[in-house]
Each structure stands twice: as structure tokens, then as C-alpha cells.
């Protein structure tokens, strides 16, 4: 059955009176057709329907099982990884899939992370509740990495010639457009110049001090697109742009590229992921922070996965993730301090991501988009319970967001200028839409006339100068995302949408018959989204009959070890490192090289800043890894080898919270600390409140993550010297 659409005209209503002047809104629905009203420059409400796996044009496929991992006691990290590597060695079928790894019922203990780094691999549980991956240890990374290789190669850069490209446009004029062809992969980059920053009031946030203000190049947006049509210099793309390109504020560019290392068509489904933690500390943070991290990947999915105890995110889509679907997922009982960069439960920094039918408890930012997420990104039919912070964009300029039938329990939905918060986030979004949402308060402000944020058919307390319509009223269609998708594909999508049934016919004066019927309904427990998700049946096969067991497949030895006995002997040899007369020697030979002093204060997370960052061992940015973020230790060791650095001069952070970089000697109002975090060698107590708003340190408790990083670095450096 097609999603119901009935005639509406969005207008501005208020309790007790109707405004006496006419106001035109940007969307009308009549005779089952959506009509978008463009402004005088051609800007209109975005088409969000290209979000998700394969731009939501296909259902998520059922991939055949090719290897089975039976339950076994002990550490299962290597067994599961070996099964994934086995599937990676298989030839893809015509659809690009190699096959699925089927995990048995039971609790699989893991000491390390699981990595999917080859296209066409699915990790599948036999039972969503009974197939459990339990991550142990003090590592704060992800339990599962769905991650390709960042080997993006820009081949050509073409100037955008169009003077103005409106919001939602897919066609633009470029220099030498004839050099392009249908199917080419391109990126469109919009610059962020000084004049544009000043026009938004984001150069200075107060105090006459510009340190936290946006700087030129900080907010460049880059959209990843495919060429659909070329007509002379006119190029048509497969998905709309979420912000207008205005030549008055700088020249945009179209880049052609090749990205061989990016993976695609991978999935994680039908299981429960749990982060183990120290039960003596209810706010323990020396455990796994992220359930699933998706990076350098497109057209992938996560579905029917439960998450428990993660301090950071259940799922985070990194800025190099695109066309990702996360659906029918539940996150409960997060374990962490209550503070900044924690409990960002369903979080995207990428584009064309779709989170649908997701449920989160006790998150701080349950449904969130991060720094310069280019969009569009959509959250459809998502609920939170006991939220501890707002949902929306939680950093700077994440544009083209849709919150469609989203309920935030006990906190806000926010589109606004965050000012200096989040290390100078400023305007958090533009051209975004709240559609039939509920929250404690909905904040909907607009940064500019051609960067309008809107809220239609929402229930809450309200604030903001964005575009509002039918507040505290139900509107149709029930889901704008699926109405747009049906219109674009010209077919019904009700089965895929699985919209939770709700009676939206409200009246304060029902007839006697209606009142009696409503009284009968009141005896039935209300169907919640959590139960609606739980009732969804998993379609793909979970039968292990006839599927190879990983324990019956011979393990392949690496070529280096198989062909070189001297290498094996070398790995078993422990070099003798001594200090003689103040000189460092290894096996009697003088070690020579430079030194590197770790950064131990200051830092930002903007892309421009990261390019200039220096390697660190105990710098921590939740959910994000790389230079200037949470450094991967092997990358630090490689840096030392390349630069002929012998000594890494380690020091703990001068202070933990980047708010302290202002040198103000004040107690902070809350625990919304700013990253990157330079860790201290001692752990938190979980008790009391320190001046930065987190719990006080326990000087008798070592910071297990801090010391494990130093140990791992020492071991890795030792291996590199052999």
C-alpha cells in the first residue's frame, strides 16, 4: 500500500488565532503530489531520498553464507578475522559480493578488533540476541572496522562557471565539461572565504576575540557525486547539492578522481555487540568506545544490531563514508563520563547516510551529524529515551540534514548557531528539515535566506527564526523521506519504509462512539519503536548446514614467514638495548637519530588544522583515528622510521580539556569538554566533579589506556629495530 498522502497547505497557526497576513511556505502537497516552491534564486527544500545504500534505489541484498564460525571458548579475534580474510580471498559474484561469514550462537570473546577491508563481505550473526561479540581490554577503538584505504587520487580540477547554483540543484556548468562522461566519479568543493564567514557572523563569537572564530578554508564542503549526464559544459550529478554555490563568495571546483582502495557492498547484521568494562567504575572509560566504524567505504550497511555499554558511538560513519544505511539498531546502557564527545550514539560525518528505525537510550547526542558533513543525511523514524543532550548537528556546518519522525525524550533537537561551543562550532547546519518530530524543545534558526532551516508538523516548545508550519499538528505524508523516494522512483516503498502505525487523528471533542473506541484502545500497551524494531524478522539465511567451518579451512601462512626461516629467527631474537656512558646502544652498536617531542596542549579538529598536526601517542579523539586525532601506533612508528627519529619525548597533557587553552582560571559550567584530549597518566575516580565538569581524578589509579599506548609503542618500536 502506498504511503498515504492527503492534501495539506502548510501555514502558520497559533493557539487561539490565525495570523492576519499571508505567508508562503516552501512545500505543498496536493492530490498525492508534492509541490516545492522555489525562492527567487531557485533554492528549494532538498530531496533527501538519495541517502542510504545504493541511494535507497535497491533493497539491502541477502548475501549467501560461505563460511561458518562455530562458537568456541577463549579469544576468538583471530578465528573471526581469519574467516573474513578467507572470504576476502574469494572471487566476487556478478553483483560484487564474495559472501557472508556466519557466526554461531554464543558469546564470542574478543581481545582485539575485527576488520572488514575488502569489498563484498558481510559479517552475519545466527541470532540477533544470541550471537554476541564481547570486546574486552582497555583499547578505546572500535569493535568492528569497516574500512578501506584512503588512496584517493585527484586527476583533474575544473572550475565551476555557474555564477549561482541553488540549493538542491544537480546541474552546474564547469570549464571543459566536455572532458567528462556519464559514470565519472567527481567531487564538488565549495570554498569558505572570509567574506562569507563574516556574513554568517562566525568570524568572532564574542569578547572581541577571534581565536575560536571560523577561518578561511575551515568550512569547505566537498560533495562526492557521480556524473549522470553531460551536455556541453553542463554537468548533471546523481544527487543534489545541499548548499548554494555563490561565485560572490569564491569559485567552486569540480574534481575528477580515482579511489581504488575504497570498499563497497559490505555489511554487519543480526548480532549483539557489547563493550566489556570495569564493573567497579560505573563511569569507566578504559574499554571499547565504538561499536562499528565505517571509513573509506560506500554502499555499505549495518542492520539489526544491538549495542551495549559503548562509551562513544554505536555506529560512526566517518567523513569518507557515503551511501550507508544503518537500520533497526538498538543502543542501550552506555558506560562513560557524562561529558563532551561521549555517547554520540548514531553519528555521521559522511554524506548520503540513512539511519532509520534506530533506538537509543541515555545518549548525550543520540542522533548526530558532525563537522562539515556535506550531506544530505537522514534520520528517519528514530527514538531516544532519557537523552542527556541535544540531537541534530553537533559541530560546524553539517548541511542538508533531515530528521523525519524523530522523537527525542527529555532533550532538544537543534539547528542553530552554537557560537563558541564545541571549540567554535558556530552555525551547525543549513538547509535542514525537522518533519513531524517531537522533543523537549525544537530550536530551528536559519543562518541566511538561501540557507533556510525548517520545522513542519513538530511537537515541542519552540525557538528560532527558521521557517515553521503546522506546529503541534500532524501533517501528511507521514514520512517526507519515503514520499520523496516514492516520487523519485515512481514506485511504492511502504514495505521498505516500515512506518510504525500511529493514529494521527486528534480531537479534543470526539463523538461518543469514537470516545468508546479510544477507551478500548487505551487498555492495549502502546506499540513502541523499540518493540517495532524487535519484531522485524531477519530475511537472509542463517542456516549453517553445508557451509564450510573456519576450523576445517587450513590457515595460509604469510609469504614472508613461509619463505624465510631467517625472518622467523629474527622475530624471535630480542635485541639488547643498553645505555653506556650516556649513549644508547643496541647489541653494542651506537643508535643514532633525532628526537620528537609530543604535543601536549592545544589543538583543533578542523580539517585544515589536522594537516599540520604532529604525531602523538596518548592524544585521544573519540571515534576518530589518524594524524591529529587518535594516532594509530603503527603510523607513529612509521613516522619515526621515515624521519630517522630515535627518541620520542613523551609527556602527559598539560591539561585535558581544550577549553583550558583560553587560560581562564574558572570552573566550567558543565562537562562538555573539547577535544583533542591529551590524556593524564592517572584515571578518573567516577566520583565528584572536577573543574572541567567530569569526575575527579584518582591519583592512585593508573590510566590503563594511557599506559597501554606507551607499552604498545615500545613493543612496536622494538620490533622495528630488529
Task: Report residues per predicted region.
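Mature N-terminal, pre-catalytic/accessory segment of carbohydrate-active enzymes
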Residues: 23, 529-639
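Aromatic- and acidic-residue-enriched carbohydrate-binding clefts of CAZyme catalytic domains
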Residues: 600-617, 660-708
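Catalytic domains of carbohydrate-active enzymes, especially glycoside hydrolases
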Residues: 631-656
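Conserved small/polar residues in nucleotide/adenosyl-binding loops
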Residues: 712-719
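Right-handed parallel beta-helix
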Residues: 120, 129, 192-224, 228-229, 264-354, 367, ...
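Extracellular "leader-to-stem" segments immediately downstream of a signal peptide or signal-anchor
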Residues: 7, 12, 21-281, 455-559
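Short glycine/acidic-rich loop motifs that flank beta-strands on beta-rich extracellular proteins
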Residues: 92-93, 112-113, 132-136, 236, ...
Amino acid at each position: 500500500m502506498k504511503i498515504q498522502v492527503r492534501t495539506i497547505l502548510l501555514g502558520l497557526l497559533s493557539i487561539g488565532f490565525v495570523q492576519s497576513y499571508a505567508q508562503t511556505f516552501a512545500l505543498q502537497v496536493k492530490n498525492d503530489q508534492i509541490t516545492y516552491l522555489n525562492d527567487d534564486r531557485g533554492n528549494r527544500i532538498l530531496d533527501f531520498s538519495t541517502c542510504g545504500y545504493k541511494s535507497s534505489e535497491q533493497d539491502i541484498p541477502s548475501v549467501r553464507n560461505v563460511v561458518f564460525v562455530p562458537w568456541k571458548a577463549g579469544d576468538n579475534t583471530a578465528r573471526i578475522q581469519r574467516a573474513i580474510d578467507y572470504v576476502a580471498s574469494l572471487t566476487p559474484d556478478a553483483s560484487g559480493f564474495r559472501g557472508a561469514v556466519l557466526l554461531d550462537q554464543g558469546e564470542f570473546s574478543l581481545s582485539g578488533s575485527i576488520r572488514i577491508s575488502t569489498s563484498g563481505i558481510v559479517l552475519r550473526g545466527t541470532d540477533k540476541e544470541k550471537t554476541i561479540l564481547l570486546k574486552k581490554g582497555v583499547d578505546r577503538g572500535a569493535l568492528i572496522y569497516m574500512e578501506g584505504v584512503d588512496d584517493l587520487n585527484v586527476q583533474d580540477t575544473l572550475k565551476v562557471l555557474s555564477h549561482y547554483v541553488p540549493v538542491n540543484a544537480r546541474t552546474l556548468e564547469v570549464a571543459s565539461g566536455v572532458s567528462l562522461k556519464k559514470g565519472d566519479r567527481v567531487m564538488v568543493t565549495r570554498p569558505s572565504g572570509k567574506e562569507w564567514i563574516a556574513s554568517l557572523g562566525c568570524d568572532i563569537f564574542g569578547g572581541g576575540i577571534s581565536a575560536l572564530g571560523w577561518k578561511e578554508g575551515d568550512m569547505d564542503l566537498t560533495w562526492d557525486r557521480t556524473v549522470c549526464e553531460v551536455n556541453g559544459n553542463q554537468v548533471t550529478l546523481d544527487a543534489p547539492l545541499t548548499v548554494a554555490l555563490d561565485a560572490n563568495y569564491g569559485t567552486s571546483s569540480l574534481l575528477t578522481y580515482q579511489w581504488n582502495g575504497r570498499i563497497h557492498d559490505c555489511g554487519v547484521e543480526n548480532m549483539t555487540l557489547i563493550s566489556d568494562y570495569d564493573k567497579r567504575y560505573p563511569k569507566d572509560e578504559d574499554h571499547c568506545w565504538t561499536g562499528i566504524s565505517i571509513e573509506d567505504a560506500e554502499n555499505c550497511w549495518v542492520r539489526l544490531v544491538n549495542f551495549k555499554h559503548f562509551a562513544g558511538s554505536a555506529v560512526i560513519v566517518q567523513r569518507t563514508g557515503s551511501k550507508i544505511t544503518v537500520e533497526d539498531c538498538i543502543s542501550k546502557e552506555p558506560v562513560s563520563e557524562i561529558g563532551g564527545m561521549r555517547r554520540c550514539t548514531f553519528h555521521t560525518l559522511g554524506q548520503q547516510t540513512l539511519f532509520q528505525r534506530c533506538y537509543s537510550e541515555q545518549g548525550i547526542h543520540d542522533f548526530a551529524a558532525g563537522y562539515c558533513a556535506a550531506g544530505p543525511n537522514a534520520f528517519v523514524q528514530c527514538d531516544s529515551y532519557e537523552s542527556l543532550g541535544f540531537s541534530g548537528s553537533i559541530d560546524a556546518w553539517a548541511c542538508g540534514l533531515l530528521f523525519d519522525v524523530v522523537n527525542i525524550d527529555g532533550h532538544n533537537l537543534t539547528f542553530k548557531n552554537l557560537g563558541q561551543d564545541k571549540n567554535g562550532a558556530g552555525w551547525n547546519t543549513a538547509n535542514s528539515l525537522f518533519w513531524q518530530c517531537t522533543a523537549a524543545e525544537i530550536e530551528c534558526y536559519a543562518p541566511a535566506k538561501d540557507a533556510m532551516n525548517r520545522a513542519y508538523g513538530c511537537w515541542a516548545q519552540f525557538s528560532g527564526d527558521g521557517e515553521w508550519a503546522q506546529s503541534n499538528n500532524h501533517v501528511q505524508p507521514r514520512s517526507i523521506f519515503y514520499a520523496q523516494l516514492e516520487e523519485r522512483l515512481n514506485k511504492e516503498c511502504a514495505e521498505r519504509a516500515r512506518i510504525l502505525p500511529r493514529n494521527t487523528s486528534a480531537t479534543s471533542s470526539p463523538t461518543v462512539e469514537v470516545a468508546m473506541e479510544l477507551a478500548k484502545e487505551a487498555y492495549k500497551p502502546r506499540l513502541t519503536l523499540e518493540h517495532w524494531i524487535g519484531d522485524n524478522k531477519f530475511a537472509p539465511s542463517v542456516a549453517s548446514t553445508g557451509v564450510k567451518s573456519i576450523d576445517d579451512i587450513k590457515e595460509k601462512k604469510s609469504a614472508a614467514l613461509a619463505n624465510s626461516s631467517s625472518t622467523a629467527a629474527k622475530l624471535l631474537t630480542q635485541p639488547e638495548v643498553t645505555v653506556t656512558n650516556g649513549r644508547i646502544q643496541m647489541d653494542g652498536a651506537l643508535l643514532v637519530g633525532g628526537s620528537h617531542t609530543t604535543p601536549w596542549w592545544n589543538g583543533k579538529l578542523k580539517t585544515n588544522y589536522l594537516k599540520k598536526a604532529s604525531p602523538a601517542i596518548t592524544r585521544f579523539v573519540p571515534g576518530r583515528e589518524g594524524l591529529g586525532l587518535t594516532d594509530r601506533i603503527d603510523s607513529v612508528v612509521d613516522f619515526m622510521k621515515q624521519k630517522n627519529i630515535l627518541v620520542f619525548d613523551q609527556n602527559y597533557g598539560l591539561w585535558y580539556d581544550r577549553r583550558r587553552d583560553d587560560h581562564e582560571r574558572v570552573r566550567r559550567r558543565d562537562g562538555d569538554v573539547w577535544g583533542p584530549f591529551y590524556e593524564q597518566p592517572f584515571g578518573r575516580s567516577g566520583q565528584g566533579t572536577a573543574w572541567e565538569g567530569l569526575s575527579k581524578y584518582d591519583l592512585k589509579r593508573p590510566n590503563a589506556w594511557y599506559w597501554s599506548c606507551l607499552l604498545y609503542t615500545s613493543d612496536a618500536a622494538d620490533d622495528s629495530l630488529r
